Amino acid sequence: MRILLAVDGSPSATRARDLVVSLPWPAGSVVRVVAALDVAPALWGGPWIPAIPAGADEYEADALRELTSVIEDARAPLEAAGLAVETDLLRGAPAFAIPDDAKLWKPDLTVVGSRGHGPVESALLGSVSSAVVDHAETPVLVARGDHVRSILLAEDGSPAGMSARDLVLGWSPLAGIPIRVVGVVDVAAPWRTGIAPTMFSAAMDLYTEMITSSRETYGQVIAATVATFQAAGRTAEGELREGDPADQLVRAVHDNAGDLIVIGSRGHTGLSRIVMGSVAHSVLLHARCSVLVVKLPHQPHHPR
């Protein structure tokens, strides 16, 4: 497999590196360690500042030395874990430089920390991590911990949800880790205010019918996914929740002390949605564990 790891020397990036080290990658796996150097935001802050401020060269040289050291610090534990490592120092804003590098290198997985810091431009701020997730064409792991001992899989039966399921099922680094398959029924209840009693009664009847149908549908989807994992020899169980999808997914991982949420980047829309882009984004913002966002590829994506 090919893993792209973005670092910046922050504790979050260190956890991301340690998470990569902790997983059992297949033989021949390669990790590309990158950092992004963008001095422009720190050096040019307004029209009154000269085009090339005094000390700009020294400032850039210092930043270059620091990020080079950060990259080399990440190399040693990865190589000690038996991984082949290559490195590069990217130029440009991290939110663009990292996805652009991923498009050229074509990793099976991009790994970033959830927050970052740096002397020049923060390489892995929450907003930057979000941008990497938005622009990457392959799965992105946003690391908040340094290990994975349990997985929560968001399931709604959508193509993106099935891509997430297939990844968990097929990727050897995730083999042997217990899985909780969670679906969320999200049907908006009617408001009584401003509705005539007879209309409200009809709306409630429709709501009851829809939520009953959704419970049955999601229950079947969850059961089928659990059966698929169990048939492959995996430990898996299902859980059906009701409410706001993002909120319930975050609560589910908290209630079960999960280490990783795996979620499709897009899912069903409408009243029965669960894994929409907005849901994945909200989970990224609020989950306290690592989040693996799986894209729906234009073509099948197979780890090398």
Language-model-detected regions and their locations in the chain:
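Small/aliphatic-rich secondary-structure junction motif
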Residues: 1-54, 81-86, 148-208, 228-239, ...
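Gly/Ser-rich helix-loop-strand patches that form or flank binding pockets
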Residues: 2, 17, 22, 26, ...
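Short alpha-helical
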Residues: 11, 93-96, 119, 127, ...
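Structural beta-alpha unit
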Residues: 12, 22, 38-41, 54-61, ...
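Hydrophobic alpha-helical membrane-association signature
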Residues: 16, 70, 160, 164, ...
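A short acidic, glycine-rich active-site loop
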Residues: 53-69, 202-220
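A generic structural signal for short
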Residues: 62-63, 86-87, 117-118, 156-157, ...
